[in-house]
């Protein structure tokens, strides 16, 4: 509810909105940057029930908030509540970053795709996306951001498989002819010849079932990445690495997607480095 929000302060406020939100690493992440750059700002967790979302969002700009991150289950809902929605957020169908303008208007953006690509480029600097097809496992909200960013980066073909095929078909309908849909039972086959492979599901996360996709078709030249970062080295990445592939864990996507929002809210472009990784994992 609105009356649980922090009292306005002279220092700018930002936070993460979700339900639940106690698990979020965003306060630790942004807190590290605020301390590192000596910024007199605050970043807080905001547990907001879905039925209170609109009320809270409209109140926040008047309480000293300059913006917010958005997590489950509000990433789709905020699009209808924002005054301005970026093209990429509209295409993906979700927003993870809100900017509260001085005139009270709410701008919604999605930086997940940016974070995904920036993570790969930081940890696999020789990656060339247009060398061959990309294969994406999963078709949920995170997958949509990955698909958009890979196509924008120039992959010549994007293969996708999802347990519910209709969701993959929806992505093909919205993102165009470069998207090729595979049946879930054929997910292993779509890895043949792929130069980039992404697990965009929650499978393999601690407490979740493992990702059961055959990896025999992986070539050692393939870059393999996983959006899951608990654990950092998922069984999927471990097997790919054992097959000679270069692998990139999912933590960096979380870190990089946060940077554009932090810069807009606090006026400092933050650095994503090993110190930040250690702070977020502590």
Curated annotation (Swiss-Prot):
User: What is an annotated GO biological process for this record, any one?
Assistant: aromatic amino acid family biosynthetic process
Q: Does the keyword Secreted apply?
A: no
GO molecular function terms attached to this record: NADP binding; shikimate 3-dehydrogenase (NADP+) activity
Query: Which gene specifies this protein's sequence?
Result: aroE
Q: Which UniProt keywords apply?
A: Amino-acid biosynthesis, Aromatic amino acid biosynthesis, NADP, Oxidoreductase
E.C. no? 1.1.1.25
Q: According to the UniProt record, what class of enzyme is this?
A: oxidoreductase
Which residue positions are annotated as catalytic?
75
Q: Does the keyword Oxidoreductase apply?
A: yes
Coiled-coil intervals, chain numbering:
none
Please give the organism. Answer: Paracoccus denitrificans (strain Pd 1222)
Indicate the family of this protein: Belongs to the shikimate dehydrogenase family.
What does the subunit comment say? Homodimer.
Q: Which reaction does it catalyse?
A: shikimate + NADP(+) = 3-dehydroshikimate + NADPH + H(+)
Question: Superkingdom of this entry's organism?
Answer: Bacteria
Question: Which named protein is this?
Answer: Shikimate dehydrogenase (NADP(+))
């Amino acid at each position: 509810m609105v009356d649980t929000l922090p009292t306005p302060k002279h220092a700018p406020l930002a936070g993460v909105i979700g339900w639940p939100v106690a698990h979020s690493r965003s306060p630790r992440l942004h807190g590290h940057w605020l301390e590192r750059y000596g910024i007199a700002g605050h970043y807080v967790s905001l547990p907001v029930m879905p039925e209170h979302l609109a009320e809270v969002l409209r109140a926040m700009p008047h309480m000293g908030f300059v913006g917010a991150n958005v997590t489950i289950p509000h990433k789709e809902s905020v699009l209808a509540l924002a005054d301005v929605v970026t093209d990429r957020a509209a295409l993906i169908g979700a927003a993870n970053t809100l900017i509260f303008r001085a005139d009270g208007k709410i701008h919604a953006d999605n930086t997940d795709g940016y974070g995904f690509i920036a993570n790969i480029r930081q940890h696999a600097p020789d990656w060339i996306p247009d060398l061959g097809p990309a294969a994406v496992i999963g078709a949920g909200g995170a997958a949509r951001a990955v698909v958009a960013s890979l196509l924008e980066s120039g992959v010549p073909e994007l293969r996708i498989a999802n347990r519910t095929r209709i969701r993959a078909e929806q992505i093909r309908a919205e993102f165009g002819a470069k998207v090729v849909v595979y049946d879930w039972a054929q997910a292993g086959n779509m890895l043949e010849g792929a130069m980039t492979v992404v697990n965009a599901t929650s499978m393999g996360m601690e407490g979740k079932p493992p990702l059961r996709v055959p990896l025999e078709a992986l070539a050692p030249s393939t870059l393999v990445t996983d959006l899951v970062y608990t654990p950092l080295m998922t069984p999927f990445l471990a097997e790919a690495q054992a097959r000679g592939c270069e692998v990139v864990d999912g933590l960096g996507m979380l870190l990089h997607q946060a940077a554009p929002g932090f810069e807009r809210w606090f006026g400092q472009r933050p650095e994503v480095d090993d110190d930040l990784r250690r702070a977020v994992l502590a």
